[in-house]
């Protein structure tokens, strides 16, 4: 029997409820595939501020470092919005990414046939199908570059610096090409190489890496055009690879193409099999503790964990198929409910997925 250690961070708001359902799924998968998952629950975010005075306690980071993967719910909420920036719950995410060396963020955006009506796009666009993956560089670029304020010609000024080196670009490009090999073998590299020097280096480096993957088609888009194409014809995309700031914007846009943010998981990875997995939605404190939250993004995050950290691809497909079967049977949480479907709560949705596994 294989054994894996999973650090569990329920976090704030609905995190506790949806993580609870996801862990049941992981346990059932373990029983089916003769694998034991050992869970250690730790705190980060607002609940950690309340208890320890910091968003990311050292103990949490150490336990995560000594695990095979991390399952994260959601952090934050209006309760902590008045705190200074460094003390806010969201700082826990930056601390986890940096402390665990996670440099690649993978966000799939898929429109399920049965949920097409949720998309804000026209039917003729969405009917072509949307199943793309955005691979975003997570630890470089303008968010981590030199910044500051000064006085220029007697006027208050501020600056931020976009900087990348070849190695940072190479490693994220490899992640994208390897992902494409398992998908439809197409990578779109998004940059602003007509203006930015950092983007020119990005394009040169991605072009070099592409030579190692002759079976994968590579094309390029400037970021402004990519943003337009995502809503004009999202079906053209398979894997999109891009820098930190461009990825931050495009992943949010891609999530709204689906119209169902409660369905979308994400993974943050590094060079080995370790990863941190979480839904892309927030902590939704307004519906916390009321059995209203959609647990499917969290459950699909477990599917990504099975695939990327534990190399259990068949098990990952089982989870994805179970989710799709439940949706096809007409069950919906409130966020994706439409007239004629059957409305269920967090716990019931979790039970329905378990029954299909």
Swiss-Prot record:
What are the UniProt keywords, alphabetically?
A: Amino-acid biosynthesis, Branched-chain amino acid biosynthesis, Cytoplasm, Leucine biosynthesis, Magnesium, Manganese, Metal-binding, NAD, Oxidoreductase
The record's subcellular location field reads: Cytoplasm
Cofactor(s) listed: Mg(2+); Mn(2+)
EC number of this enzyme? 1.1.1.85
Q: In which pathway does it act?
A: Amino-acid biosynthesis; L-leucine biosynthesis; L-leucine from 3-methyl-2-oxobutanoate: step 3/4
- The record's top EC class is oxidoreductase
The entry marks the following residues as binding Mg(2+), namely: 224, 248, 252
Q: Which catalysed reactions does the entry list for this protein?
A: (2R,3S)-3-isopropylmalate + NAD(+) = 4-methyl-2-oxopentanoate + CO2 + NADH
- Gene Ontology BP terms: L-leucine biosynthetic process
Q: Which InterPro entries match?
A: IsoCit/isopropylmalate_DH_CS (IPR019818), IsoPropMal-DH-like_dom (IPR024084), Isopropylmalate_DH (IPR004429)
What's any one GO cellular component for it?
A: cytosol
Question: What name appears for this protein in its UniProt entry?
Answer: 3-isopropylmalate dehydrogenase
Organism expressing this protein natively: Clostridium acetobutylicum (strain ATCC 824 / DSM 792 / JCM 1419 / IAM 19013 / LMG 5710 / NBRC 13948 / NRRL B-527 / VKM B-1787 / 2291 / W)
